[in-house]
Amino acid sequence: SRVSRGLGDVYKRQRNGILGFALVFLFLVVMLDLRLATWVAMGVPISFMGAILFFDFFGVNINMVSLFALIVVLGLVVDDAVVVGENIITEQQIYGPGYASTLKGVREVMSPVTIGVLTTMVAFAPILFVTGEFGQIMGELPIIVILVLTFSLIEVFAILPAHLAHGKPW
């Protein structure tokens, strides 16, 4: 029936999302140390969930375009977290663990990371003003990209440093 087919689609999308997250995490573990990889990976669902909370407010639905937008922005979310996280770790290796070295690490990359994110937001923003059928179809793309990147900035400058500030394993 139509309902069971719809539930099957939801299950497939959920499974694909979990598999995608697992692959991102696995890749991060191969490239980074386990602690940093874990906190960088946790930034993805935090940024996505923060954005999803505002979907209804902006009239965004979960569909193929919104899923595509989430995939497009995934790499940017991970990239920002890796840049900030790696710089924090580098400062901690030089000055020792603690809030001072963590803050120094964040401050050093705050401007370039913010400028990079804002540039991406500005690049996607004109799609908001496209009219016609294409505008109706793709109008959600910039909203999602901007929302996710906004929450990503909050995550990499507030949540990620808080987790990496102490010298404990987790």
Predicted region positions:
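Single conserved hydrophobic/aromatic residue that forms the stacking wall/gate
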Residues: 1-7, 11
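Residue-level signature of catalytic and energy-coupling elements of molecular machines
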Residues: 9, 24, 41, 45, ...
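Loop-to-transmembrane-helix entry motif
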Residues: 12-21, 33, 37, 105-116, ...
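Interfacial segments of transmembrane alpha-helices in multi-pass membrane proteins
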Residues: 14-63, 129-133
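Hydrophobic alpha-helical interface/terminus motif in multipass membrane transporters
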Residues: 26-27, 54, 84, 88-91, ...
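Hydrophobic transmembrane alpha-helices
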Residues: 27-31, 43-44, 56-57, 61-82, ...
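Transmembrane alpha-helices and their membrane-interface boundaries in multi-pass membrane transporters
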Residues: 74, 78-86, 110-129, 137-170
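Helix-loop junctions and hydrophobic alpha-helical segments within the transmembrane domains
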Residues: 85, 91-115
